[in-house]
Structure formats: C-alpha cells, structure tokens
Amino acid sequence: CMPLQYIAGKMVVVRSLIAGLKLIPVAPCGHPLKELKEAPTFAAMIPMQVYNSLQVPEEKHLLKHIKHLIIGGGAIDTSLGNELKDFPNHVWSTYGMTETLSHIALRRLNGKEASDWYTPFENVRIRLSEENTLIIHAPNVCAEELTTNDIAEINEEGKFRILGRKDNTINSGGVKIQIEQVETTLRKHLSIPIQITAAPDAKFGEIVVLLYNKVEDEKEIKAVCEEKLPPYWQPKRYLPVEQLPLTGTGKPDRATARRIARGE
C-alpha cells in the first residue's frame, strides 16, 4: 500500500522476497485494509493510513490483528499513539530515509516495551553534530556518515528521539521556535488536524502561522493556543484552508504550507 517510487514501497517488496512472504498488492490509498478479508502478517503504513483505518470498525479489527505493523513517513501524534497502546501484537514507529534504504531504528508503540526513544539497529552508530542534528553511520548501506537535518537527543543508553527538523525552525523576534514542538503540544489538546508554518513579518522577521481545515471552529483553536502555548509560540495568524498540504507519502508538505502562509 506504499507507492513504489518511494523507498518505503520498494523495501516492502524486498522484505517479502527475502523472507519468502506472500506479497499482497494494494494500490496506495488512504484505506489500505478496505478490500482485505483477513489481516496480513506484516504491514507498513504511514500515520494517515493508520488513522483512517481506525475510523472504520472493520478496518480497525484487521489493523489490530496485524502481527507486525510498522509505521513511518511521518510523526505519530499523541492521540494516534494512545489508540495503538492496547493493540495485542507488535506495533512500531520507524526512523529512516531514502539514503539509509528505509529505517535504521525502531521504537515500540504498544505493550510493556512502548517508548518515546528509538533504538538503532545493532550495526548502526549515531551521534550529534554541533547543531544537535543526528549523524548516522550505517556501514551496511552507506560508506560515509550521513548528517541529517533532524534535531535530536541521545540518552545514555544510546537511544534517540527526534525534536524537530533544522529547516523547520521559525526565528521570530530572535526566538527560535521548533514547528514540530508547537504541533505536538497542540495535538495533545486538539482532536483536529492542524499545521504550523511561518510567514515573513516586518517587525519580527517571521511569525507563527496556523493552518486548519476551513470547516473547523477557529475560536476553539485559538482558545487552546492561548491557554496551552507559551506567548512566543502562539500563532499571530490563523489561516483556514480547503485541505492541509501533504506530500505523496502523507507527510506535512512544509514548502507548500509556507507558500500558503505567504499568500502565494
């Protein structure tokens, strides 16, 4: 159910060939379990597909009975993570990119082993750059170290968590604001999808802008922002849109969001 032009889709095929699994082809869509009669042993999905499947009882039943479910291609917000905590089988969030041939680390989302920290594979080494971005050494897939744009934290056990992306930092009046941290905070209190982006401003240099689907109540969103966010994180503008911009793999399309905020 992943597009084959992306590494995530290609690696599903590779895994099935290496493990001798029966590959069940499903056209990439928002409801990959819709036509299935029984749960697969293994599945790889993006958060949007998992979220959609949870809204349909028949699909949710199948989702719960996938023995090994990996979720990648985007952040898993608090509400989605909470819905997966009680799943009976193995549910994982993955971390990786095209350059690493899919994921190089996993974190468990359910059961006693659930964690906020990613565990790198045995042959993968990680460290932080001077800018606190994650550096990956995965010699089996890449001869040289790979410096990412992901701002990370590494604990004493060698596990890591992602705080945001270097290129997703808003500099507003000299205060650096990480887009993902604002979104994560709001998702704990809002059940509706939103996106945070930036727009140029003569006074502050950049301002925080919140995009939301136009059918939602702006007053409710604004009230949550004013109550739950620090003053310098609070959006200066709220923009209703027909649809929040997403990439082909279901990630927030940050470039398009910025263009919308700039009125382009």
Enumerate the predicted regions with their spans.
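Gly/Ser/Thr-rich phosphate-binding loop
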Residues: V56-G111
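AMP-binding/adenylate-forming core of the ANL superfamily
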Residues: R125-T147, I151-E153, K159, N213
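AMP-binding/adenylate-forming catalytic core of the ANL superfamily
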Residues: I151-W233
